Amino acid sequence: MNEAIIQLDHIDITFRQKKRVIEAVKDVTVHINQGDIYGIVGYSGAGKSTLVRVINLLQAPTNGKITVDGDVTFDQGKVQLSANALRQKRRDIGMIFQHFNLMAQKTAKENVAFALRHSSLSKTEKEHKVIELLELVGLSERADNYPAQLSGGQKQRVAIARALANDPKILISDEATSALDPKTTKQILALLQELNRKLGLTIVMITHEMQIVKDICNRVAVMQNGVLIEEGSVLDIFSNPKEALTQEFITTATGIDEALEKINQQDIVKHLPANALLAQLKYAGTSTDEPLLNSIYRQFEVTANILYGNIEILDHIPVGDMIVVLEGQAENILAAEKALHEAGVDVSILKRGA
């Protein structure tokens, strides 16, 4: 089992503005393992960005303990490292943002080289390093282009290369794909996954989009009003969300709410027969495809009319939703429901026939 490379224990962050006290983060504990792609999700103002800024102490907490790669960096209300040791620690932590923060008057390779200005490498070694980094992010042919000549996705690739210049062990992505179109977002996420695999990079993803968490992360924390309300593997959170906000994020990512609106307009649902019901089937790692639905027909003479189906592969395990009309004798439908539950399927009755 991987060890935690980031340990945030009982973190409080309080700001004082004139007569107001703002509790931005309240007693949050998060442990992130080496090699994780860890998502922190929440709406604007949830405290996500404020929390992760304590990892490299760009933001000092009010209370709590921070341990990064085995070193206690903050405890008992104060920084535990010397100024030099803190600078060194920060080099182990790269950051990318929604806004690329590239220098307009410098080329792509010059922007990356700027991150190496305090490096002990020789001039030749720095030049080779920059070439390697641009190759790593798939941008070597754009090395001499200025930011104005690059697309949004290409600018973010330069920013990623720059963030990796000092060989960090941790990369923090603060809404790094928010300004990108969906296609470019997928390409950047694929690049981050590749860097995670190739370099063993631990990535902390701050986002308000559960779709991004679903696409790239293996663990996720959900924040609301400065509080961590739910945390776990992406598989567990998607298959069994406990908090209302988490459920809201997941329905947005899966599109189930939009599907239900359309389904409710269909004649078959508007005029549901007395011996039928509309049900949502949720499952993780269980087959709810044709064989299982066929088996409830064979055993109980209950037919299943599939109106909607969505399946995702999370951590190599199928997780999905189906909306079906189950039709048959009342006692047979009850028996079919029980059989589905026993097969690991969560059955929610949305409407009963009149």
From Swiss-Prot:
CDD domains cross-referenced by the UniProt entry: ABC_MetN_methionine_transporter
Cysteine pairings via disulfide bonds: none
Predominant subcellular localization, coarse grouping: membrane
Positions contributing to ATP binding: G42, Y43, S44, G45, A46, G47, K48, S49
Enzyme category, top tier: translocase
Catalytic activity field: L-methionine(out) + ATP + H2O = L-methionine(in) + ADP + phosphate + H(+); D-methionine(out) + ATP + H2O = D-methionine(in) + ADP + phosphate + H(+)
A single GO cellular-component term on record: plasma membrane
Protein keywords: Amino-acid transport, ATP-binding, Cell membrane, Membrane, Nucleotide-binding, Translocase, Transport
Coiled coil: none
InterPro entries referenced in this protein's UniProt entry, alphabetically: AAA+_ATPase (IPR003593), ABC_transporter-like_ATP-bd (IPR003439), ABC_transporter-like_CS (IPR017871), ACT-like_dom_sf (IPR045865), MetN_ABC (IPR041701), MetN_ABC_transporter-like (IPR050086), NIL_domain (IPR018449), P-loop_NTPase (IPR027417)
Membrane topology: Peripheral membrane protein
UniProt-annotated location(s): Cell membrane
Single Gene Ontology MF annotation: ATP binding
Annotated Gene3D superfamilies: 3.30.70.260, P-loop containing nucleotide triphosphate hydrolases
EC nos: 7.4.2.11
Pfam families according to UniProt: ABC_tran, NIL
ABC transporter domain segment(s): 8-250
Domain of life the protein comes from: Bacteria
Role, per record: Part of the ABC transporter complex MetNIQ involved in methionine import. Responsible for energy coupling to the transport system.
Assembly behavior: The complex is composed of two ATP-binding proteins (MetN), two transmembrane proteins (MetI) and a solute-binding protein (MetQ).
Similarity-based family: Belongs to the ABC transporter superfamily. Methionine importer (TC 3.A.1.24) family.
This protein's name: Methionine import ATP-binding protein MetN
Source species: Streptococcus pyogenes serotype M12 (strain MGAS2096)
Gene (name only): metN
